[in-house]
Amino acid sequence: MVKGLYTAYTGMVNEQNRMDIMTNNLANASTVGYKKEGSTSQSFNDVLTVKIKDQSVGMRNVQKIGIKNPGVKIGENYTDYTQGSFRITDNTYDLALAGDGFFAIEFTNKAGETDTKYTRAGQFTLNKDGYLVTEEGDYVLDTQNRRIRLNTLLDSKITDDGTIYQNDQAVARIQVTDFEDYDYLEKYGETYYQPIDGAKTTTADAQVKSGYLEMANVQIVSEMVNLISITRAYESNQKVVQTIDGTLDVAANQIGKL
């Protein structure tokens, strides 16, 4: 009976994790460059249940009862890198990537340390010093891993290969990087990614589209349907816990009075 309580509990923990992920997806449905997340479930290893020390089969004999599965556990959380839809902005520095790849960003943490992060969120602008930066103020890098600085008094044109022109002169080229295996990317915040040990870069085939933004790849209706399904599964496990709790209460407090 207590094992049934544990099985229901693990089911609730698993559904709570899925619910948190779906809720975060819905919260970021309007976030530029956001990639939705998902979660897999994994069952615990089956256990062979046996009956031992039973007078009916002899003290030294073991009788097999059957296979028991003690419930489910969280498998893994993953990111869906499917490309999102494009929204037209007509802003030169709003950039979207058509194809696989990421913009390279010089990120500075609270301790003042810098490293390179990668993102699909191309909502860029020029700061007061003329540097191309993200909404958070992080610097966009060129193909030489340098900050991109432009003349704020001149109009810019950005071509599909990421080259920036001012006065018909190429002044910089935006770096677009891709990776052989996205399993070696770790999410940092909502739209940044950082490579982990073993990550290998490769040539990106993405085109840079100026005047567009890639929106989140979250399908709101689909996420809502999944959320309802998860809620019902959670409630079912919750009712199992309540039922077993009531049964244990009867066994402990009422049967003993007879």
Where are these regions (language model features)?
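Amphipathic alpha-helical polymerization modules
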Residues: 1-258
